[in-house]
């Protein structure tokens, strides 16, 4: 891939600014955890796995900012750093997974001096990024096996290299099928209101010379009905124990339409996106974002001033609409509650 979503370089976090794509390919530098938190909140970086990496790197930066003379003081301040970052995006469970992993590293090495702990936290954050790339390629390998030769694939939002350390989850499946020479083509929903499909997915696939056609969100059902879609694959921000899946708003509609038209609908996500503490999707917190994201496009007002707006960033697709969940350890189908627990060794 010709871009890097996020990386640690010279004690700085470097992120591609996804709010400026596709017009400009700009990389921002962050030297403190507050900047990283603002980048997560402001959608400079987005996508559950990428948010988890950013959160971990933000903690590593925060650890370098802490002035303390004991581990207890250091750890209390580290928890404050995690709390600030944790308030940015409540739905993506990878965010909290990354924070907990960083806190665990600090606690496991509390007998070391603080500079050594800071270095271990930096190393852990970098490891999370490295691991994610390998995980996405495994997801792509498992998912590509499900795709038939010449398939037309529909995807929603962006679950690609921009949403991960690289390669992607849903787009990892697409990349895997493309690399296997299956002659696929992709239909990308534009994905209002942030237009991740139009701005990001189309940009990524075009850079990789994967055939892609952009469609408006309300075209998907008609394309399915007229036999133009063979396979649907999306990412996930949180998956409950029963397989209910939170993903970008509009995913539920795609899943229902796919089932109505007898088209397989798959979710592609790493195991870190599972939240087996939640029995079902009704318990997943749904982020509500600013009304201006709906009433404006690039600062231009497109709706009447003062109109009431709902802007949930995510919806929850019940497990009954999901053909299978593609993870780095394989594909889970059917009895999600039992199979997801088995996948993580519970």
UniProtKB/Swiss-Prot annotation:
This protein's record includes keyword Isomerase: yes
Regions that span the bilayer: none
Positions with a binding annotation for substrate: 46-48, 89, 196, 247-248
Active site: 237 (proton donor)
Pathway where it operates: Amino-acid biosynthesis; L-methionine biosynthesis via salvage pathway; L-methionine from S-methyl-5-thio-alpha-D-ribose 1-phosphate: step 1/6
InterPro entries on file: IF-2B-related, IF-M1Pi, IF_2B-like_C, Initiation_fac_2B_a/b/d, M1Pi_N, NagB/RpiA_transferase-like
Record keywords, A-Z: Amino-acid biosynthesis, Isomerase, Methionine biosynthesis
GO molecular function, one term: S-methyl-5-thioribose-1-phosphate isomerase activity
Top-level taxon in the UniProt lineage: Bacteria
EC number: 5.3.1.23
One BP term from GO: L-methionine salvage from methylthioadenosine
Reaction catalyzed: 5-(methylsulfanyl)-alpha-D-ribose 1-phosphate = 5-(methylsulfanyl)-D-ribulose 1-phosphate
Site (Transition state stabilizer): 157
Keyword Magnesium: no
Biological role stated in the UniProt entry: Catalyzes the interconversion of methylthioribose-1-phosphate (MTR-1-P) into methylthioribulose-1-phosphate (MTRu-1-P).
Family: Belongs to the eIF-2B alpha/beta/delta subunits family. MtnA subfamily.
Name by which UniProt lists this protein: Methylthioribose-1-phosphate isomerase
Lineage: Bacteria, Pseudomonadati, Thermodesulfobacteriota, Desulfuromonadia, Geobacterales
Gene field: mtnA
